[in-house]
C-alpha cells in the first residue's frame, strides 16, 4: 500500500516539476519552431509542449476554472474589436481569426497549467537558467572584446521562424558587444534575469544578485538597465517601509 502511495506522490511531483520547468524554459525556446507553412501557420516547440502538458494535467483533473473562462471572454472581446478594426482597414481577416483562436487556446492551456502547484519549481528553474545565462553573458562579453570566437547562444539543430532572426552577442550593424546569453536578444535576457534578480534580492542572496546585475549591465540593453534600476529602487523602498 505504501509503495502505491509513494508512486502516486512521485508522479504528482514529477508532473509539477515538469510544468514548472516548462514555464521557466519557455522564454528560451520561444523563437524555435517545429514546422512553418507559408506565412499563416507556425507550430512552435512551446506549442507542442504546452498542449502535451495540458492534456496530462487535464487527465488528472477535469475541473474548468471560472477565472479561465473570464480570461477567455476578455480575449474574445478584444479579438472581436481587432476583427472590426480589420474590417475598417481591409487587412487579412483569416489571419485575425487564426490569431484569436490561438490566443484563446493559450489562455485555456496556460491558466490551467499555472493552477498546478508548480511555483516553487518554477522559481528554482528560473534561478538555474538565469545563472547559466548570466555566466554565458560574461563569457560572451569578454570573448567579444578579446576577439575570441564564442557560442552565440542559439541552440544547434533547432530552426527559427521565417521572419525571426538571432541577434547574437555582436551587433551586426554597429559591431557593438551586446551579450544575449541563450536568448534571442539582449533585452529578452534582461527581462528574464530580472525575475531571478528580484527573487535573489528578496532572499538576500548577495552573490547571485551581483551576478545577475553584472550580466544585465553587460547587455547594454536599455530595457535591461531600466528594469535593474527600477526593481532595485522599488525593493529598497519596500524593505525600508517595513
Model feature map: region roles:
Residues 9-21, 62-76, 119-126, 207-208:
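Membrane-interfacial loop-to-transmembrane alpha-helix junctions, especially the N-terminal start
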Residues 73-77, 90-114, 125:
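Aromatic-anchored transmembrane helix interface
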Residues 21-31, 75-86, 132-139, 213-220:
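Aromatic-anchored segments of alpha-helical transmembrane domains
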Residues 1-62, 80-86:
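N-terminal signal-anchor transmembrane segment
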Residues 54-65, 110-119, 199-206, 233-241:
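Structural signal for the C-terminal ends of transmembrane alpha-helices
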Residues 29, 40-59, 97-108, 187-197, ...:
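Membrane-embedded alpha-helical segments of multi-pass membrane proteins
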Residues 124-148, 167-220, 225-238:
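Alpha-helical transmembrane segments of multi-pass inner-membrane proteins
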Residues 145-166:
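Juxtamembrane non-transmembrane "cap" segments at the membrane-aqueous interface
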Amino acid at each position: 500500500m505504501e509503495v502505491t502511495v509513494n508512486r502516486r506522490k512521485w508522479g504528482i511531483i514529477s508532473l509539477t516539476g515538469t510544468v514548472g520547468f516548462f514555464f521557466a524554459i519557455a522564454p528560451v525556446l520561444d523563437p524555435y519552431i517545429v514546422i512553418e507553412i507559408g506565412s499563416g501557420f507556425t507550430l512552435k516547440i512551446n506549442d507542442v509542449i504546452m498542449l502535451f502538458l495540458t492534456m496530462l494535467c487535464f487527465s488528472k483533473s477535469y475541473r474548468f476554472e471560472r477565472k479561465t473562462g473570464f480570461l477567455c471572454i476578455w480575449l474574445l472581446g478584444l479579438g472581436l474589436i481587432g476583427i472590426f478594426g480589420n474590417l475598417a482597414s481591409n487587412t487579412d481577416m483569416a489571419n485575425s481569426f487564426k490569431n484569436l483562436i490561438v490566443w484563446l487556446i493559450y489562455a485555456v492551456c496556460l491558466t490551467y497549467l499555472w493552477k498546478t502547484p508548480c511555483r516553487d519549481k518554477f522559481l528554482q528553474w528560473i534561478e538555474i537558467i538565469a545563472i547559466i545565462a548570466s555566466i554565458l553573458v560574461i563569457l560572451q562579453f569578454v570573448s567579444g572584446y578579446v576577439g575570441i570566437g564564442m557560442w552565440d547562444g542559439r541552440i544547434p539543430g533547432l530552426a527559427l521562424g521565417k521572419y525571426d532572426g538571432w541577434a547574437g552577442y555582436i551587433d551586426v550593424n554597429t559591431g557593438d558587444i551586446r551579450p544575449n546569453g541563450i536568448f534571442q536578444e539582449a533585452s529578452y535576457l534582461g527581462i528574464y534575469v530580472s525575475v531571478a534578480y528580484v527573487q535573489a534580492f528578496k532572499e538576500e542572496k548577495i552573490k547571485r544578485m551581483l551576478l545577475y546585475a553584472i550580466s544585465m549591465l553587460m547587455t547594454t540593453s536599455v530595457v535591461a538597465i531600466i528594469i535593474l534600476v527600477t526593481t532595485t529602487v522599488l525593493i529598497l523602498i519596500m524593505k525600508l517601509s517595513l
